[in-house]
Structures are given as C-alpha cells and as structure tokens.
Regions:
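N-terminal signal peptide c-region/cleavage motif recognized by signal peptidases
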Residues: 20-23
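Acidic, glycine-enriched catalytic cores built around paired aspartates
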Residues: 13, 17
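Bacterial N-terminal signal peptides that target proteins for export
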Residues: 2-12
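Surface-exposed, glycine- and small/polar-enriched segments that build interaction surfaces at terminal
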Residues: 26-194
Length: 194
C-alpha cells in the first residue's frame, strides 16, 4: 500500500518540477506579447469545467498543465493544455494544446495545436496547427494541416484540400490553393508565394 503512495508522490513531484521549470522558462524567454498580459499571478496547474467554474480564475496565467474537462479560459498558457471540448486563451499559448473540438488563442510563439474540428488564432501564430479547419491572422514560420486552412499573411506551409492566404511567402499543397495577392491567385495541387 505504501508503494502506491510513493509512486503517486513521485508523479506529483515530477509534474510540479516540470511545471516550475516551464514557468521559469516562460518568464525568462517567452515574455507574453499579447495585450492581455495582466500581470496576474501564474499557476503551474489549472483545472476547469467551464468558464466561471475553474481553479484558478480566468485572469490567471498557467505555466505548466491546464486540464479543461469541458471548456476552460485563461490569459496566457505555457506548456501543456488539454481540453475535453475546448481550450480558450485570451493571450498567448506556447507548448502543446489539444482539444476534442476547438482551440482559440490570441497568439503563439511556438505551439503544437490539435483539435477535432477547428483551431483559431486571432493574431500571430508560430508552430503547427492540425485540425479539419484552421484559421489564423498571421503565420510566420509555421504549418497548417487540415481540410480548410485560412490565413491573412503567411510564411510556411499549408497542406489541405482548400488553402487560402491573402499574402504568402510559402507553399500551399492541396486540391484548391488560393493566394489572393499573387499573379496566379488560384492554382490546383501546388501554389507558391514569394
């Protein structure tokens, strides 16, 4: 019986240590650029059922693990973000974000974002988005993989059935590829922006 508690204690201590290291890394190198950085405290662990019923509250930053049973919403999230239905962040996300249905963030500086239906990033995204639908303001140095990918300004790779970018300095691979601000705005299979 005592061995079970020892294993549990070791797991909790490991998670706490990882979370504190991520928190320090987030403070030292990944300074949030989003306007939502409220200067609130940062927690290594957050548990959410839905906005308004979560610990800690929405105004906190999470630097470690955020577990959203249904839907969770916080300012900035650094490290691992897991949601049963949806993850919502008003500010910046860095690390890994996985949701059953939907992810929504303000911006990212290095994020693997995976969702069952859609990923949305309001501003600048750096990283990899994987979902049937990916929508982002600006991708600089990233990939979008899905059925439909949409971005305003793009540097990287879009891989999907339909890819749309207003401006692109990257590659699109898919059935229909659209770069609005291009000499050849619509091409099948491959479209390159310069």
């Amino acid at each position: 019986m005592q061995h079970k508690y020892s294993l549990l204690k070791a797991v909790v201590m490991t998670v706490a240590l990882c979370a504190s290291n991520v928190s320090m890394a987030a403070d030292a190198r990944m300074v949030p650029t989003a306007s939502y950085n409220s200067g609130c405290a940062q927690t290594p662990l957050a548990l959410s059922f839905f906005p308004g019923f979560q610990l800690p509250g929405e105004d906190w930053d999470v630097g470690g693990l955020r577990l959203d049973v249904f839907v969770g919403r916080h300012n900035n999230v650094y490290a691992l973000d897991i949601g049963g239905l949806a993850n919502l962040s008003k500010g910046e996300n860095c690390g890994i974000e996985v949701a059953g249905i939907y992810n929504q963030i303000g911006s990212s500086k290095g994020l693997l974002q995976v969702a069952g239906i859609a990923n949305y990033c309001k501003d600048s995204f750096v990283g990899l988005q994987i979902a049937p639908i990916n929508v982002t303001g600006t991708v600089s140095g990233g990939w979008q993989i899905g059925l439909f990918n949409r971005v305003e300004a793009f540097t990287g790779l879009q891989l999907g059935l339909v890819n749309y970018a207003y401006q692109s300095k990257g590659a699109q691979i898919g059935l229909l590829n659209i770069i609005s601000d291009s000499m050849l705005p619509v091409l099948p299979i491959v479209n390159l922006g310069f």
